[in-house]
Amino acid sequence: MELPNMNILSITPIYIAILGILFVPFTMRVGLYRVKNKIDLGDGNDDTLFKLNRGQGNFVETVPLAVVLLLLMELLGAGTTWLHTLGALLVGGRVLHYVGITGVGPGIGRPVGMFATFGVYAVASFWILLDVLG
């Protein structure tokens, strides 16, 4: 007898997987740069390593809360349009921020990426409050 599919999450895991895949090269760039330039701990006052560290670090600091909010939205029954829009905005925002912070010179990617991430935080948080508080 085959059991019914009990997966209740079908959208958020897509974005979590994409973000997990992105995290690999973001982190590997730091490690490879450290090995190449023989910088074991800290940033060795190396501007490039500092930027790579912050690009990867900011990803670690911002993604977990965002995906928890998306997971709660999905568990509470948010529509696919909400979830795909916010998931895509999060992924796009994180890529823009990473490219902006690790690139040469000031770029628009960093502020646009943070604005996108803050947008996901705000919209998802308000959606959850409105749903729970009725």
Give the location of each predicted region.
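N-terminal signal-anchor transmembrane alpha helix
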Residues: N7-N37
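Physicochemical signature of membrane-embedded alpha-helices that form the seven-helix bundle of GPCRs
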Residues: Y15, N53-Q56, L86-L89, G113-A116
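Cytosolic, membrane-interface loops and tails of multi-pass inner-membrane proteins
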Residues: M28-R54
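Small-residue-rich segments of transmembrane alpha-helices in multi-pass membrane proteins
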Residues: D47-F50, V112-F126
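Core segments of transmembrane alpha-helices
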Residues: G57-L70, Y121
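Mid-chain, well-packed structural core segment of small domains
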Residues: A66-T102
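Interfacial loop-to-transmembrane junctions
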Residues: L96-V120
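Juxtamembrane boundary at the C-terminal end of a transmembrane helix
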Residues: F126-G134
